[in-house]
Protein backbone atom coordinates (compact mmCIF):
# COMPACT_ATOMS: atom_id res chain seq x y z
CA UNK A 1 0.00 0.00 0.00
CA UNK A 2 1.37 3.36 -0.92
CA UNK A 3 2.30 5.65 1.89
CA UNK A 4 -0.03 8.54 2.49
CA UNK A 5 1.28 11.93 1.40
CA UNK A 6 0.77 14.71 3.90
CA UNK A 7 1.20 18.19 2.46
CA UNK A 8 3.41 20.60 4.47
CA UNK A 9 1.63 23.48 6.02
CA UNK A 10 3.46 26.81 5.76
CA UNK A 11 2.55 29.15 8.55
CA UNK A 12 2.86 32.89 8.03
CA UNK A 13 3.25 35.09 11.05
CA UNK A 14 0.63 37.76 11.23
CA UNK A 15 1.85 41.30 10.57
CA UNK A 16 0.08 44.37 11.78
CA UNK A 17 -0.85 47.08 9.32
CA UNK A 18 1.31 49.63 11.10
CA UNK A 19 4.50 47.61 10.48
CA UNK A 20 4.12 47.51 6.68
CA UNK A 21 5.16 51.16 6.02
CA UNK A 22 8.12 50.76 8.36
CA UNK A 23 9.32 47.68 6.48
CA UNK A 24 9.02 49.44 3.13
CA UNK A 25 10.95 52.43 4.43
CA UNK A 26 13.78 50.20 5.64
CA UNK A 27 14.06 48.55 2.22
CA UNK A 28 13.94 51.60 -0.03
CA UNK A 29 15.75 54.11 2.18
CA UNK A 30 19.33 53.20 3.19
CA UNK A 31 20.67 54.62 6.44
CA UNK A 32 22.81 57.78 6.22
CA UNK A 33 26.51 57.11 5.54
CA UNK A 34 29.42 58.77 7.29
CA UNK A 35 31.29 61.35 5.25
CA UNK A 36 35.05 60.64 5.40
CA UNK A 37 37.93 62.52 3.84
CA UNK A 38 39.69 60.52 1.13
CA UNK A 39 42.96 60.76 3.08
CA UNK A 40 41.67 58.49 5.86
CA UNK A 41 40.24 55.86 3.53
CA UNK A 42 42.73 52.97 3.05
CA UNK A 43 43.75 52.43 -0.56
CA UNK A 44 44.77 48.80 -0.75
CA UNK A 45 47.14 46.90 1.50
CA UNK A 46 50.24 48.88 0.63
CA UNK A 47 52.96 48.27 -1.93
CA UNK A 48 51.78 47.00 -5.28
CA UNK A 49 48.31 46.31 -3.81
CA UNK A 50 47.80 50.01 -3.07
CA UNK A 51 46.47 52.69 -5.41
CA UNK A 52 48.89 55.46 -6.41
CA UNK A 53 46.44 57.18 -8.74
CA UNK A 54 48.94 57.01 -11.61
CA UNK A 55 48.01 55.47 -14.94
CA UNK A 56 51.22 55.40 -16.98
CA UNK A 57 52.02 54.30 -20.51
CA UNK A 58 55.66 53.25 -20.80
CA UNK A 59 56.98 53.04 -24.36
CA UNK A 60 60.16 50.96 -24.51
CA UNK A 61 59.27 49.06 -21.34
CA UNK A 62 60.95 45.85 -22.53
CA UNK A 63 64.37 47.50 -22.63
CA UNK A 64 67.12 47.92 -20.03
CA UNK A 65 65.72 51.02 -18.31
CA UNK A 66 62.09 50.12 -18.98
CA UNK A 67 61.95 47.07 -16.73
CA UNK A 68 63.16 49.14 -13.77
CA UNK A 69 60.64 51.92 -14.41
CA UNK A 70 57.75 49.45 -14.72
CA UNK A 71 58.85 47.72 -11.53
CA UNK A 72 58.90 50.97 -9.54
CA UNK A 73 55.54 52.06 -10.91
CA UNK A 74 53.94 48.68 -10.21
CA UNK A 75 55.45 48.46 -6.75
CA UNK A 76 53.77 51.72 -5.73
CA UNK A 77 50.34 50.61 -6.97
CA UNK A 78 50.20 52.22 -10.40
CA UNK A 79 48.45 50.90 -13.47
CA UNK A 80 50.95 50.51 -16.30
CA UNK A 81 50.21 50.14 -20.00
CA UNK A 82 53.07 48.43 -21.85
CA UNK A 83 52.98 48.86 -25.64
CA UNK A 84 55.31 46.35 -27.29
CA UNK A 85 56.31 44.97 -30.70
CA UNK A 86 57.88 41.74 -29.46
CA UNK A 87 56.48 38.28 -28.81
CA UNK A 88 54.23 38.05 -25.72
CA UNK A 89 56.71 35.64 -24.12
CA UNK A 90 59.34 38.40 -24.14
CA UNK A 91 57.17 40.44 -21.77
CA UNK A 92 56.58 37.71 -19.19
CA UNK A 93 59.14 39.17 -16.78
CA UNK A 94 57.05 42.35 -16.50
CA UNK A 95 53.79 40.67 -15.45
CA UNK A 96 54.65 40.03 -11.75
CA UNK A 97 55.79 43.64 -11.28
CA UNK A 98 52.26 44.86 -10.56
CA UNK A 99 49.11 43.62 -8.89
CA UNK A 100 46.64 41.44 -10.78
CA UNK A 101 45.39 43.30 -13.84
CA UNK A 102 47.56 46.36 -13.24
CA UNK A 103 50.14 45.62 -15.97
CA UNK A 104 48.37 45.82 -19.33
CA UNK A 105 50.05 44.75 -22.57
CA UNK A 106 49.13 45.82 -26.08
CA UNK A 107 50.67 45.71 -29.54
CA UNK A 108 51.68 48.98 -31.13
CA UNK A 109 53.38 50.37 -34.21
CA UNK A 110 55.58 53.43 -33.88
CA UNK A 111 54.59 54.59 -37.35
CA UNK A 112 50.84 54.26 -36.69
CA UNK A 113 49.41 57.16 -34.68
CA UNK A 114 46.15 55.31 -34.10
CA UNK A 115 47.97 52.57 -32.19
CA UNK A 116 49.83 55.23 -30.19
CA UNK A 117 46.52 56.92 -29.42
CA UNK A 118 45.03 53.67 -28.11
CA UNK A 119 48.02 53.28 -25.82
CA UNK A 120 47.84 56.76 -24.25
CA UNK A 121 44.15 57.69 -24.32
CA UNK A 122 43.48 56.55 -20.74
CA UNK A 123 46.84 57.55 -19.22
CA UNK A 124 47.78 60.49 -17.03
CA UNK A 125 51.52 59.92 -17.57
CA UNK A 126 53.43 58.90 -20.69
CA UNK A 127 57.11 57.89 -20.52
CA UNK A 128 59.16 57.51 -23.69
CA UNK A 129 62.07 55.09 -23.25
CA UNK A 130 62.23 53.96 -26.87
CA UNK A 131 65.85 53.41 -27.86
CA UNK A 132 68.21 51.37 -29.98
CA UNK A 133 71.95 50.69 -29.76
CA UNK A 134 72.37 50.20 -33.50
CA UNK A 135 70.46 50.90 -36.69
CA UNK A 136 68.53 48.24 -38.59
CA UNK A 137 66.93 48.01 -42.02
CA UNK A 138 63.53 48.77 -40.48
CA UNK A 139 64.44 51.53 -38.03
CA UNK A 140 67.37 53.92 -38.18
CA UNK A 141 68.36 56.42 -35.47
CA UNK A 142 66.20 59.15 -36.99
CA UNK A 143 63.14 56.91 -36.74
CA UNK A 144 63.87 55.81 -33.17
CA UNK A 145 65.02 59.09 -31.64
CA UNK A 146 63.24 61.76 -33.72
CA UNK A 147 60.13 60.62 -35.58
CA UNK A 148 58.69 58.18 -33.03
CA UNK A 149 59.20 60.49 -29.98
CA UNK A 150 57.68 63.38 -31.91
CA UNK A 151 54.64 61.25 -32.82
CA UNK A 152 54.21 60.05 -29.22
CA UNK A 153 54.49 63.62 -27.91
CA UNK A 154 51.98 64.92 -30.44
CA UNK A 155 49.39 62.22 -29.77
CA UNK A 156 49.88 62.57 -26.00
CA UNK A 157 49.31 66.31 -26.24
CA UNK A 158 46.12 65.79 -28.24
CA UNK A 159 44.90 63.16 -25.77
CA UNK A 160 45.29 65.52 -22.82
CA UNK A 161 48.08 63.63 -21.06
CA UNK A 162 49.10 65.48 -17.90
CA UNK A 163 52.80 64.58 -17.80
CA UNK A 164 55.18 63.51 -20.54
CA UNK A 165 58.66 62.19 -19.68
CA UNK A 166 61.23 61.91 -22.49
CA UNK A 167 64.62 60.23 -22.03
CA UNK A 168 67.49 61.70 -24.04
CA UNK A 169 71.26 61.53 -23.42
CA UNK A 170 73.73 63.72 -21.54
CA UNK A 171 75.98 64.08 -24.60
CA UNK A 172 73.21 64.74 -27.12
CA UNK A 173 74.63 67.35 -29.50
CA UNK A 174 73.74 68.31 -33.03
CA UNK A 175 77.49 68.68 -33.76
CA UNK A 176 78.49 65.28 -32.37
CA UNK A 177 80.44 62.81 -34.51
CA UNK A 178 77.94 60.15 -33.39
CA UNK A 179 74.69 59.88 -35.36
CA UNK A 180 73.10 58.42 -32.23
CA UNK A 181 73.84 61.58 -30.23
CA UNK A 182 72.92 63.90 -33.11
CA UNK A 183 69.54 62.19 -33.43
CA UNK A 184 69.01 62.44 -29.67
CA UNK A 185 69.58 66.20 -29.85
CA UNK A 186 67.08 66.62 -32.69
CA UNK A 187 64.58 64.45 -30.83
CA UNK A 188 64.84 66.69 -27.75
CA UNK A 189 64.07 69.74 -29.86
CA UNK A 190 61.07 68.10 -31.55
CA UNK A 191 59.60 66.91 -28.24
CA UNK A 192 60.03 70.33 -26.62
CA UNK A 193 58.31 72.06 -29.53
CA UNK A 194 55.47 69.53 -29.66
CA UNK A 195 54.90 69.18 -25.90
CA UNK A 196 56.34 72.30 -24.18
CA UNK A 197 55.43 71.02 -20.70
CA UNK A 198 57.39 67.78 -21.21
CA UNK A 199 60.10 66.77 -18.75
CA UNK A 200 63.31 65.84 -20.57
CA UNK A 201 65.91 63.73 -18.77
CA UNK A 202 69.51 63.52 -20.00
CA UNK A 203 71.32 60.64 -18.26
CA UNK A 204 75.00 59.84 -18.66
CA UNK A 205 76.06 56.27 -19.45
CA UNK A 206 73.88 54.04 -17.28
CA UNK A 207 75.31 51.00 -15.51
CA UNK A 208 73.39 48.08 -14.03
CA UNK A 209 73.06 44.31 -14.23
CA UNK A 210 71.93 44.19 -17.86
CA UNK A 211 73.85 47.23 -19.13
CA UNK A 212 75.89 47.66 -22.29
CA UNK A 213 78.54 49.74 -20.55
CA UNK A 214 80.41 47.84 -17.84
CA UNK A 215 79.48 44.51 -19.43
CA UNK A 216 80.75 45.81 -22.77
CA UNK A 217 84.23 46.47 -21.41
CA UNK A 218 84.31 43.26 -19.36
CA UNK A 219 83.55 41.23 -22.49
CA UNK A 220 86.44 42.79 -24.42
CA UNK A 221 88.70 40.24 -22.72
CA UNK A 222 87.64 37.67 -25.33
CA UNK A 223 89.68 39.63 -27.88
CA UNK A 224 92.94 39.15 -25.99
CA UNK A 225 93.22 42.73 -24.74
CA UNK A 226 91.46 46.05 -24.33
CA UNK A 227 91.63 48.30 -27.41
CA UNK A 228 91.16 51.98 -26.54
CA UNK A 229 91.67 55.09 -28.63
CA UNK A 230 94.58 57.03 -27.05
CA UNK A 231 94.45 54.39 -24.29
CA UNK A 232 91.28 56.09 -23.02
CA UNK A 233 93.30 58.86 -21.38
CA UNK A 234 91.56 61.64 -23.31
CA UNK A 235 88.01 60.56 -22.43
CA UNK A 236 86.17 61.28 -19.17
CA UNK A 237 83.08 59.38 -18.05
CA UNK A 238 80.59 60.01 -15.23
CA UNK A 239 78.33 56.91 -15.21
CA UNK A 240 75.06 56.87 -13.27
CA UNK A 241 73.37 53.93 -11.53
CA UNK A 242 70.21 52.53 -13.13
CA UNK A 243 68.18 52.62 -9.90
CA UNK A 244 69.03 56.30 -9.36
CA UNK A 245 67.80 57.12 -12.86
CA UNK A 246 64.58 55.22 -12.19
CA UNK A 247 63.99 57.00 -8.88
CA UNK A 248 64.59 60.32 -10.62
CA UNK A 249 61.97 59.50 -13.25
CA UNK A 250 59.40 58.49 -10.61
CA UNK A 251 60.08 61.63 -8.55
CA UNK A 252 59.78 63.77 -11.67
CA UNK A 253 56.29 62.32 -12.15
CA UNK A 254 55.33 63.24 -8.59
CA UNK A 255 56.94 66.71 -8.61
CA UNK A 256 54.65 69.35 -10.15
CA UNK A 257 57.62 71.72 -10.52
CA UNK A 258 59.36 69.30 -12.93
CA UNK A 259 56.99 70.16 -15.78
CA UNK A 260 58.78 71.82 -18.67
CA UNK A 261 62.26 71.30 -17.21
CA UNK A 262 65.33 69.46 -18.48
CA UNK A 263 67.36 67.37 -16.01
CA UNK A 264 70.91 66.01 -16.26
CA UNK A 265 71.42 62.72 -14.40
CA UNK A 266 75.06 61.89 -13.63
CA UNK A 267 76.97 59.87 -11.09
CA UNK A 268 78.90 61.41 -8.17
CA UNK A 269 82.38 60.87 -9.66
CA UNK A 270 84.20 61.41 -12.96
CA UNK A 271 86.81 58.95 -14.26
CA UNK A 272 89.28 58.74 -17.08
CA UNK A 273 88.11 55.96 -19.36
CA UNK A 274 91.46 54.19 -18.84
CA UNK A 275 91.05 54.17 -15.04
CA UNK A 276 87.42 53.13 -15.29
CA UNK A 277 88.14 50.12 -17.52
CA UNK A 278 91.10 49.18 -15.33
CA UNK A 279 88.76 49.14 -12.33
CA UNK A 280 86.26 46.97 -14.24
CA UNK A 281 88.93 44.33 -14.83
CA UNK A 282 90.14 44.58 -11.23
CA UNK A 283 86.65 43.88 -9.87
CA UNK A 284 86.25 40.99 -12.33
CA UNK A 285 89.72 39.68 -11.33
CA UNK A 286 90.77 39.52 -14.97
CA UNK A 287 94.13 40.58 -16.45
CA UNK A 288 94.01 44.12 -17.81
CA UNK A 289 95.93 44.33 -21.10
CA UNK A 290 95.21 47.71 -22.71
CA UNK A 291 96.67 48.77 -26.03
CA UNK A 292 96.16 51.89 -28.14
CA UNK A 293 94.15 51.44 -31.31
CA UNK A 294 93.94 54.13 -34.01
CA UNK A 295 90.56 55.71 -34.53
CA UNK A 296 90.23 54.51 -38.13
CA UNK A 297 91.16 50.93 -37.15
CA UNK A 298 88.57 50.83 -34.37
CA UNK A 299 85.89 52.10 -36.76
CA UNK A 300 86.92 49.46 -39.30
CA UNK A 301 86.40 46.75 -36.66
CA UNK A 302 83.00 48.25 -35.88
CA UNK A 303 82.09 48.09 -39.56
CA UNK A 304 82.92 44.38 -39.67
CA UNK A 305 80.51 43.73 -36.80
CA UNK A 306 77.83 45.85 -38.50
CA UNK A 307 77.77 43.70 -41.62
CA UNK A 308 77.64 40.52 -39.54
CA UNK A 309 74.24 38.75 -39.60
CA UNK A 310 74.36 38.50 -35.80
CA UNK A 311 73.82 41.10 -33.09
CA UNK A 312 76.81 43.46 -33.38
CA UNK A 313 79.17 43.50 -30.42
CA UNK A 314 80.19 47.03 -31.39
CA UNK A 315 79.53 49.50 -34.19
CA UNK A 316 81.24 52.55 -35.62
CA UNK A 317 78.76 54.74 -33.80
CA UNK A 318 79.36 53.01 -30.46
CA UNK A 319 83.09 53.58 -30.90
CA UNK A 320 82.35 57.31 -31.14
CA UNK A 321 80.03 57.28 -28.10
CA UNK A 322 82.30 55.42 -25.70
CA UNK A 323 85.17 57.78 -26.54
CA UNK A 324 83.07 60.94 -26.07
CA UNK A 325 83.72 62.86 -22.85
CA UNK A 326 80.63 63.33 -20.69
CA UNK A 327 79.49 66.94 -20.58
CA UNK A 328 79.30 69.06 -17.45
CA UNK A 329 75.97 70.92 -17.44
CA UNK A 330 75.83 72.95 -14.20
CA UNK A 331 72.92 75.05 -15.46
CA UNK A 332 70.60 72.02 -15.47
CA UNK A 333 69.01 70.50 -12.33
CA UNK A 334 70.03 66.96 -11.48
CA UNK A 335 69.20 63.98 -9.30
CA UNK A 336 69.64 65.91 -6.07
CA UNK A 337 66.96 68.39 -7.15
CA UNK A 338 64.54 65.45 -7.29
CA UNK A 339 65.55 64.14 -3.89
CA UNK A 340 67.83 61.34 -5.13
CA UNK A 341 71.38 60.84 -3.85
CA UNK A 342 73.65 59.49 -6.59
CA UNK A 343 75.15 56.07 -5.83
CA UNK A 344 78.93 55.65 -6.27
CA UNK A 345 80.04 53.22 -8.96
CA UNK A 346 82.25 51.39 -6.47
CA UNK A 347 79.25 50.29 -4.38
CA UNK A 348 77.28 48.67 -7.21
CA UNK A 349 79.87 47.55 -9.78
CA UNK A 350 80.10 44.13 -8.16
CA UNK A 351 76.43 43.46 -9.00
CA UNK A 352 77.30 43.79 -12.68
CA UNK A 353 80.76 42.25 -12.77
CA UNK A 354 80.55 39.27 -10.42
CA UNK A 355 79.37 37.03 -13.25
CA UNK A 356 82.56 37.85 -15.17
CA UNK A 357 84.73 36.33 -12.43
CA UNK A 358 86.16 32.83 -12.42
CA UNK A 359 85.00 30.38 -9.77
CA UNK A 360 88.10 31.03 -7.68
CA UNK A 361 87.18 34.68 -7.15
CA UNK A 362 83.39 34.36 -7.24
CA UNK A 363 82.90 35.10 -3.52
CA UNK A 364 85.78 37.54 -3.14
CA UNK A 365 84.88 40.76 -1.34
CA UNK A 366 84.75 44.07 -3.15
CA UNK A 367 86.97 45.61 -0.45
CA UNK A 368 89.91 43.70 -1.94
CA UNK A 369 89.87 46.03 -4.98
CA UNK A 370 91.27 49.54 -4.95
CA UNK A 371 88.68 52.19 -5.93
CA UNK A 372 89.01 53.75 -9.35
CA UNK A 373 90.90 57.03 -9.59
CA UNK A 374 88.61 60.02 -9.90
CA UNK A 375 89.18 63.47 -11.37
CA UNK A 376 87.69 66.80 -10.31
CA UNK A 377 84.28 67.74 -11.67
CA UNK A 378 85.91 70.64 -13.49
CA UNK A 379 88.33 68.23 -15.21
CA UNK A 380 88.82 67.79 -18.97
UniProtKB/Swiss-Prot annotation:
UniProt entry keywords in alphabetical sequence: Acetylation, Electron transport, FAD, Flavoprotein, Mitochondrion, Respiratory chain, Transit peptide, Transport
Database matches in InterPro entries: ComplexI_NDUFA9_subunit (IPR051207), Epimerase_deHydtase (IPR001509), NAD(P)-bd_dom_sf (IPR036291)
A GO BP entry: ubiquinone biosynthetic process
FT transit peptide: 1-35
Subcellular location: Mitochondrion matrix
Pfam families: Epimerase (PF01370)
Modified residues (N6-succinyllysine): 175
Subunit structure: Complex I is composed of 45 different subunits. This a component of the hydrophobic protein fraction. Interacts with BLOC1S1. Interacts with SLC2A4. Interacts with CLOCK. Interacts with RAB5IF.
Sequence similarity: Belongs to the complex I NDUFA9 subunit family.
Protein name: NADH dehydrogenase [ubiquinone] 1 alpha subcomplex subunit 9, mitochondrial
